[in-house]
């Protein structure tokens, strides 16, 4: 059963405050232990990443990114943490930017998108 709306509202307020400060550690502090991160649309084939994999990358991204097209969050069962974060961004830009970003920060090349049926 989901947490009471008051707990979810408090968590959302903390998330919005972290957004205003644009501080990676403030965001990460709200993530649950089972947190996952997903870039949308799914048709791009980007993998879902767990907290321990995305946290170091997220700290670097926050320093350079200034906006997103859309972001979706899901609360943990207790309502006091963020369980899942999904973001939508400019795919045409990301095709050129991702390899440069991963090379610059030493993450290697980004995962290759899987072919989507009918494409």
UniProtKB/Swiss-Prot annotation:
Top-rank taxon of the source lineage equals Eukaryota
Listed SUPFAM superfamilies: NTF2-like
The pathway to which it is assigned is: Pigment biosynthesis
Q: Which residues cross the membrane?
A: none
State the conditions that upregulate or repress this gene: Expression correlates with the formation of the sclerotia and thus the pigment production and is directly regulated by the cluster-specific activator CPUR_05433.
Q: What does this protein do?
A: Part of the ergochrome gene cluster responsible for the typical purple-black color of the ergot sclerotia. The ergochrome gene cluster produces several ergot pigments including the yellow ergochrome secalonic acid and its derivatives, as well as the red anthraquinones endocrocin and clavorubin. The pathway begins with the synthesis of atrochrysone thioester by the polyketide synthase (PKS) CPUR_05437. The atrochrysone carboxyl ACP thioesterase CPUR_05436 then breaks the thioester bond and releases the atrochrysone carboxylic acid from CPUR_05437.
The name this protein goes by in its record:
Ergochrome gene cluster protein CPUR_05426
**Lineage per the UniProt record:** Eukaryota, Fungi, Dikarya, Ascomycota, Pezizomycotina
